[in-house]
């Protein structure tokens, strides 16, 4: 689910949010991106 994406997904310094994005999409959200090195899902 969404919360596990935040914990699991590593967010790099320069927008490497692919892992976060994939995780969020699997959780049923539109996309994911990184804010202060944390994965955030966009519903």
From Swiss-Prot:
Disulphide-bridged cysteine pairs: 5-23, 11-34, 20-39, 24-41
List the Pfam families hit by this protein, alphabetically. Toxin_17
Q: Which GO terms describe its molecular function?
A: potassium channel inhibitor activity; toxin activity
Q: InterPro entries this protein is in?
A: Ergtoxin (IPR012622), Scorpion_toxin-like_sf (IPR036574)
Q: Does the keyword Coiled coil apply?
A: no
Q: Name one GO cellular component term.
A: extracellular region
Question: Could you tell me in which tissues this protein is expressed?
Answer: Expressed by the venom gland.
Name its cellular compartments. Answer: Secreted
Q: Which keywords accompany this UniProt record?
A: Disulfide bond, Ion channel impairing toxin, Knottin, Neurotoxin, Potassium channel impairing toxin, Secreted, Toxin, Voltage-gated potassium channel impairing toxin
The primary site where this protein sits is secreted
Q: What does this protein do?
A: Reversibly blocks Kv11/ERG potassium channels.
So what family is this one in? Belongs to the ergtoxin family. Gamma-KTx 4 subfamily.
Comment on protein domains: The presence of a 'disulfide through disulfide knot' structurally defines this protein as a knottin.
Q: What's the protein name?
A: Potassium channel toxin gamma-KTx 4.8
Species, as recorded = Centruroides elegans
Query: What does UniProt list as this organism's lineage?
Result: Eukaryota, Metazoa, Ecdysozoa, Arthropoda, Chelicerata
């Amino acid at each position: 689910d969404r919360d596990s994406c935040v914990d699991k997904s590593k967010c790099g310094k320069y927008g490497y949010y692919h892992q976060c994005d994939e995780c969020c999409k699997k959780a049923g959200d539109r996309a994911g991106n990184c804010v202060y090195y944390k994965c955030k899902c966009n519903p």
